[in-house]
């Protein structure tokens, strides 16, 4: 009888962890690169965007969980195009660091800005499409191994 009770408790624990663990959020398990892609890349996105694009994307990409992110930019270009910016013109970042690079050409982007009257949990954004240069921070090259 004790073994059956232990098995039942273990099964319940596994079931509860299965429900709780996903609610911890993808943000806690993602790398910086994955976070950048989630928050800023939308290669497949329609350009120009619909007026509700930002409301939909900000929510689906987890940027309205717990609070409304005030602003965000989505880039509608292949990831390889954005990664290649790291070999283009170096500029000083807003924080004073020198690991930022400016795109040599304009890219298709959508800016999302929280409307002034909007309050969590009903995050409401304005959607503005444009073609602009972007500046991204690139990590220092890391030598992982020699073989």
UniProtKB/Swiss-Prot annotation:
Coarse class of the protein's main subcellular location: secreted
Active site per UniProt: 40, 142
Molecular functions per Gene Ontology: lyase activity; nucleic acid binding; ribonuclease A activity
Known function: Endonuclease that catalyzes the cleavage of RNA on the 3' side of pyrimidine nucleotides. Acts on single-stranded and double-stranded RNA.
Subunit structure: Monomer.
Gene Ontology biological process: defense response to Gram-positive bacterium
Subcellular location: Secreted
UniProt protein name: Ribonuclease pancreatic gamma-type
Alphabetically ordered keywords of this record: Disulfide bond, Endonuclease, Hydrolase, Lyase, Nuclease, Secreted, Signal
Signal peptide boundaries: 1-25
Family to which this protein belongs: Belongs to the pancreatic ribonuclease family.
PANTHER family (UniProt xref): RIBONUCLEASE (PTHR11437), RIBONUCLEASE PANCREATIC (PTHR11437:SF24)
Domain of life of the organism encoding this protein: Eukaryota
Residue pairs linked by disulfide bridges in the UniProt entry: 54-112, 68-123, 86-138, 93-100
One Gene Ontology CC term in the entry: extracellular region
Pfam families: RnaseA
Amino acids binding substrate: 35, 38, 69-73, 94, 113
Reaction it catalyzes: an [RNA] containing cytidine + H2O = an [RNA]-3'-cytidine-3'-phosphate + a 5'-hydroxy-ribonucleotide-3'-[RNA]; an [RNA] containing uridine + H2O = an [RNA]-3'-uridine-3'-phosphate + a 5'-hydroxy-ribonucleotide-3'-[RNA]
Enzyme kind, highest EC tier: lyase
Source species of the chain: Rattus rattus
The enzyme's E.C. designation: 4.6.1.18
């Amino acid at each position: 009888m004790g073994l059956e009770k232990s098995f039942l408790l273990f099964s319940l624990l596994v079931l509860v962890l299965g429900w709780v663990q996903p609610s911890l959020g993808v943000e806690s398990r993602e790398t910086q690169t994955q976070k950048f892609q989630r928050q800023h890349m939308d290669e497949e996105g329609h350009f120009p965007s619909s007026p509700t694009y930002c409301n939909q994307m900000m929510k689906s990409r987890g940027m309205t969980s717990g609070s409304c992110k005030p602003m965000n930019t989505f880039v509608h270009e292949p990831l390889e195009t954005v990664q290649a910016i790291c070999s283009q013109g170096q500029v000083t970042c807003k924080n004073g660091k020198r690991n930022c690079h400016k795109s040599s050409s304009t890219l298709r982007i959508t800016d999302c800005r929280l409307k002034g009257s909007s309050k969590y949990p009903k995050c409401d954004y304005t959607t503005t499409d444009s073609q602009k240069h972007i500046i991204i921070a690139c990590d220092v090259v890391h030598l992982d191994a020699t073989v």
